[in-house]
Amino acid sequence: MPAVRTKSGHGVEYTDEAITATYSYNTTRVEKEANGDVTVQPIQLHLKFRTQRKVQRTGVMLIGWGGNNGTTVTAALMAHKHRXSWRTKTGTKQPDYLGSITQSSTMSVGLTSEMEEVFVPMKALVPMINPAELVIGGWDCSGMNIADAMRRAQVLDVTLQDALYNYLKDMHPLPAAFDLDFVAENQLSRADNIMQTKNKWESVEQLRADIRNFREKNSLEEVIVLWTANTERFSEHITGVHDTADHLIDAIRRNENEIAPSVLYATAAIMEGCSYVNGAPQNTLCAGLIELARRHGVFVVGDDFKSGQTKVKSGLVEFFMDAGIKPECIASYNHLGNNDGYNLAAPKQFRSKEVTKGGVLDDMVSSNSILYPPGSRGPDHCIVIKYLPYVGDSKRALDEYNFSIFMGGEQTVVLHNTCQDSLLAAPLIIDLVVLTELMHRVTVTQCDGEDCCDKKEKMTSYTHMETVLSLLSYLLKAPRVPEGTPVVNGLNRQGQAIKNVLRALVGLPPDNNMQLECRLPFLRGVGS
């Protein structure tokens, strides 16, 4: 992989310990008048980013380790670690990271003096963990070892399964915290590995012990806990239960009914100093949990992996609306036959998924008062998910988009997407872990003025990003954001946020695509 380094003397310092970058953040503040007029004030803030270069020895504990996603990502990482290969009818295959933005995407770093645009791997800009070096563990309500669970999932080619079987057969999930009130009753048949605790607080204590043992056994510096288990029903967030950290802890101690298993895992993770990622639709990340995470100085990330239909939708609707074309009606239909689909066949669990898939349009609709004037409704939008066992992990997504176009015209776009659900989700798990680990190593401070960044006495203390790590919204269907800040669902905007923050870490300006060097002849020689 090529080395990428910002030229010295441009506000960036590379040491063995850290990359320190002075950065001018140009933004705006807007005032809206009662008559609709808008006044925009440009603002420049002077920041200093510090990125620790030493990647932490990191483990990830997967909740739902024995499911399709958990076994697929574990098997894939073992294939990379042991450099496995496997034969298919089209030839011999090697392990890859297709679908991972950190491992398989590139980003522009600018133009050469000959006006050639240069792209580099995203992972080349700052030190990122090698996914094959992650230590994997976790919990599952099924006690089947990971090798047999991989075979049960029926996702990977049989020859690859056979090649990896011996690497996985001694991996066993820990007993899970399980409450049938929060998942479909049809999940009871595979629940043979349940934690034998008397109450919810005892479950939290056991989960904390599991995390400590995992960390100590594997000599880990960081542990990230990630939910990739079945979708829970929505919890009713109750004042006095979910609203503050202290209320939440007290509610768990008194065994409150409306505390879901996912909240127990998140609480245990946070209290053990681990960031928590919610890869499912349920509303785990209540106000009390976020306050608890802030208190312990860790991140929470959510909600729900954005892997297939919703990723396409968030990109396509953004594209059409940016073109001034009005979405009027969107009908989305899915069928799949894996255990995720089996669980979602229950109405309460489907409702959780419907909410996260349905909210993807909200901010884009509200952003365009020309297409959707105040008081008008957004596009008609419905979502259907059906369980058909025959198709297994090969999910079908069918979408019909209806648009209004120029002078009363109409346009219809129909998509049929066949994809293996877990092969799209597994790379997202990798990215969520890689980027969360990176953000553990990034701190930032604000300077008093443009020249103050060399004057340590005038700098406030370095701090991490906000507890709710909204930077990772690109990877999630229903991105959680800090309270009082806007939700962004547009796929391109989400992706650009990640890339531009990475650029900031090495002192580069945001990639705004102006490319004035190409449009103003007198700028062609600048920087030569």
UniProtKB/Swiss-Prot annotation:
The keyword Isomerase is assigned to this record: yes
Cofactor list: NAD(+)
Positions with a binding annotation for NAD(+): 66-69, 140, 187, 190, 228-231, 279, 304, 307, 338-340, 353, 392-393, 421-422
Pathway note: Polyol metabolism; myo-inositol biosynthesis; myo-inositol from D-glucose 6-phosphate: step 1/2
Domain of life (superkingdom): Eukaryota
Catalysed reaction equations from the record: D-glucose 6-phosphate = 1D-myo-inositol 3-phosphate
Localization terms from the record: Cytoplasm, Cytosol
Regulation of activity: Activated by ammonium ions.
InterPro entries per record: Myo-inos-1-P_Synthase (IPR002587), Myo-inos-1-P_Synthase_GAPDH (IPR013021), NAD(P)-bd_dom_sf (IPR036291)
Keywords (A to Z) from UniProt: Cytoplasm, Inositol biosynthesis, Isomerase, Lipid biosynthesis, Lipid metabolism, NAD, Phospholipid biosynthesis, Phospholipid metabolism
Gene knockout outcome: Inviable in the bloodstream form; viability is not restored by addition of extracellular myo-inositol. Levels of glycosylphosphatidylinositol (GPI) glycolipids are decreased.
SUPFAM superfamilies given in the database record: Glyceraldehyde-3-phosphate dehydrogenase-like, C-terminal domain, NAD(P)-binding Rossmann-fold domains
Chief site of localization: cytoplasm
GO biological process: GPI anchor biosynthetic process; inositol biosynthetic process
Protein name: Inositol-3-phosphate synthase
